[in-house]
């Protein structure tokens, strides 16, 4: 049975006002680094002025609240299993364009299995505060190592020294994976969903003794240049996501934000029968052009126009059990309030797009994920194969203790929402077999 999530109510400051206060206090660019504890404690919002969270669709036993002093932010979380102190923790990290809400169908079962289940709105998303919502503010705080600090700080703020399992879906997968790679003492096991983890980038090795230099990977810009030569011309979606105009394109979609989310989620789900993913031979324009247009877009279209033709019919919408109209409205309401800029910032500093991020990651060259790990995705999810070779790297080198690789029937990209019972079963069995509190 669903109920309205409870929320905490505190003082009312906007993100931009907080930045101004930080600058006035001589603290420099608040968005560029974690703030002082004193400042972080003031990063609040008046939740009573926001629409009730979850549109009445939050399952029984899940609560919504704010957690202050988390790497310079006040983080909004959903949590379950909080009633009993001392439970081992499970941390769930969502993707794009998602929210903590995306884990609503997974959390009750994990709590019933004996865990304190924590799902935050990640930096840039939803009701989490403490980041600048301006494109011009820059994306440095969204680099992967700072997002990893976010995860550690949240775990500590909630009174845990470790978590039994960290789970990351889509854009949350690299955060979860890097967390397990860097701090295996905290993140004791790992579940990767949808986006395979290729491992830390490699530094040249043994070159002083004549070993060849590493062959550079095809960059997104190089791929885009080749995609533009196709007929019709195409472009890689992550380059689009990095543009200034991506926020307005989606936020002000001509079809309306609710219809945008409905079409976007349908197009990437198993319900769209055109999703028939398979391994690609390489990261060439010809191979990548086989991927649907939500990943390899038509060059002259934004995402709103890309998904508009894939709006499902009314009878499908009325009978869609995994994503009801009330649930779609939760996403439309939250993103309608915040926009997409914060959620898109991570794409600007992804590996391969930002030299400074790559330089930071090179610190961990040669390091592997050694905690127990598993991979879960939908069988109809092109996210598995959109980066050719990534699955093999994850299974053969990035993770030394990969104990499960699961592609689920009847699921596309939104695996934990499309097939929650199967996902729950895999997560709980994995915890029983491999996780250490």
Where are these regions (language model features)?
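N-terminal secretory signal peptides
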Residues: 1-13
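N-terminal twin-arginine translocation
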Residues: 11-17, 27-45
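Hydrophobic residues on the short alpha-helix immediately C-terminal to a glycine-rich phosphate/catalytic loop
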Residues: 22, 106, 179, 183, ...
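Flexible "cap/lid" subdomain of the alpha/beta-hydrolase fold that forms the substrate-access gate
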Residues: 43-65, 75, 83, 89, ...
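Conserved beta-strand scaffold positions in the cores of enzyme catalytic domains, especially
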Residues: 64, 117-119, 405-407
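Glycine-centered tight beta-turn/hairpin loop motif at sheet-sheet or coil-to-beta transitions
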Residues: 70-72
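Conserved HGGG/HGGXW glycine-rich cap/lid loop of the alpha/beta-hydrolase fold
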Residues: 78-131, 169-171
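Catalytic active-site module of serine/aspartate enzymes centered on a nucleophile-bearing elbow/loop
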Residues: 402-437
